């Protein structure tokens, strides 16, 4: 059994739900397929989103799902295993969550809003604390951990920039060079770190010290322990764009990873195939991802409208 839609949105995060909201309000028959693995699930709260500052991510998504339902958008919890482009897009699902148990849905336009995955450095204890007292973004978490003892785990020379940035939220900052050699720091780096009062510690980090479910320190491979309450890291952002590449979308290398080539609206090099949110480029914050989804949704409605008008001429 197959189902036909005007638009299928793959991914039910901020970008996907925003695109679906616009399309639903434009009276487009839209399906959202969500696998239920949001990037910010480890975080207790999301920050910096006007009117939603401090809201738990799960609550934010629940509100978004309720909003799109008001406009007739269908949402199913399933996983896309494949998609093929012919006269339209045929999207095959893993669990058969479509009405009637169908596993294949068709659409004229396809939006991929599958986001990205944070790949943490291989240090014992990081994953368990990530989103709590191991964090990556001062704009997302800085206020909540302000004035505590910060550590910054260096994995590239760009970690110097991160260490300097977080001094806005605490004056007690230690940069653990970890896998970055002292010789990789420039004279300008060293002068800026000194001016900011950042303590620089050479040596590789072995693991974290945790007491009573709170980070209390960072342990180096030589057994030295430095008391720290918060550790900033720079995960490798891995875009979840396999579906786009399988459908033939061209990609480009960026400082933040390999992303699809898109125009200002999110349209890829494949007609009818769109990318939104962190699948379209490094959006980072939830509000930016939502904005890209909104923009793609509005553009898709226009594409469909004028395609129908041209066909009627």
Residue spans of the language-model regions?
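A conserved FAD-binding loop/helix module that cradles the flavin
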Residues: 20-21, 160-164, 276-313
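FAD-binding core/adjacent interface of flavoenzyme oxidoreductases
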Residues: 1-7, 75-148, 230, 256-264
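Beta1-alpha1 glycine-rich phosphate/pyrophosphate-binding loop at the start
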Residues: 5-59, 149, 158-183, 253
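Residue-level detector of alpha-helix initiation sites
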Residues: 13-14, 118, 157-158, 280-281
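FAD-site-proximal beta/loop scaffold in flavoenzymes
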Residues: 128-144, 237-287, 295
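A Rossmann-like FAD-binding core segment of flavoenzymes
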Residues: 62, 68-107, 170-258, 305-313
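N-terminal glycine-rich dinucleotide-binding loop that anchors FAD/FMN and/or NAD(P) in oxidoreductases
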Residues: 25, 29, 35-37, 44-71, ...
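Active-site glycine-rich loop that binds ribose-phosphate moieties when present
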Residues: 132-139, 152-163, 183-187
């Amino acid at each position: 059994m197959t189902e036909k839609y005007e638009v299928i949105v793959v991914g039910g995060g901020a970008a996907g739900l925003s695109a679906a909201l616009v399309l639903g309000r434009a009276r487009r028959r839209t399906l959202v397929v969500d696998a239920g693995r949001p990037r910010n699930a480890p975080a207790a709260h999301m920050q910096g989103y006007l009117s939603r500052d401090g809201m738990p991510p799960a609550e934010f998504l629940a509100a978004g799902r309720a909003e799109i339902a008001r406009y007739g958008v269908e949402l199913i919890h399933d996983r896309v295993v494949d998609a093929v482009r012919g006269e339209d897009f045929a999207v095959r699902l893993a669990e058969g969550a479509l009405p009637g148990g169908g596993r294949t849905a068709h659409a004229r336009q396809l939006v991929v809003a599958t986001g990205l995955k944070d790949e943490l450095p291989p240090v014992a204890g990081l994953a368990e604390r990530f989103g709590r007292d191991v964090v990556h973004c001062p704009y997302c978490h800085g206020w909540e951990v302000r004035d505590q003892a910060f550590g910054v785990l260096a994995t590239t020379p760009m970690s110097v920039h991160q260490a300097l940035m977080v001094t806005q939220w605490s004056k007690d900052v230690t940069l653990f060079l970890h896998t970055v050699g002292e010789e990789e720091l420039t004279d300008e780096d060293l002068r800026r770190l000194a001016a900011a009062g950042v303590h620089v510690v050479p040596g590789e980090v072995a693991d974290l010290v945790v007491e009573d479910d709170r980070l209390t320190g960072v342990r180096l491979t030589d057994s030295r322990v430095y008391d720290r309450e918060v550790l900033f890291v720079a995960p490798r952002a891995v875009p979840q764009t396999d579906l786009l590449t399988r459908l033939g979308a061209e990609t480009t290398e960026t400082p933040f990873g390999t992303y699809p080539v898109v125009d200002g609206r999110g349209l890829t090099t494949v007609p009818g195939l769109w990318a939104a949110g962190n699948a379209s480029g490094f959006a980072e914050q939830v509000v930016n991802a939502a904005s890209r989804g909104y923009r793609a949704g509005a553009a898709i409605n226009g594409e469909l409208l004028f395609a129908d008008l041209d066909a009627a001429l």
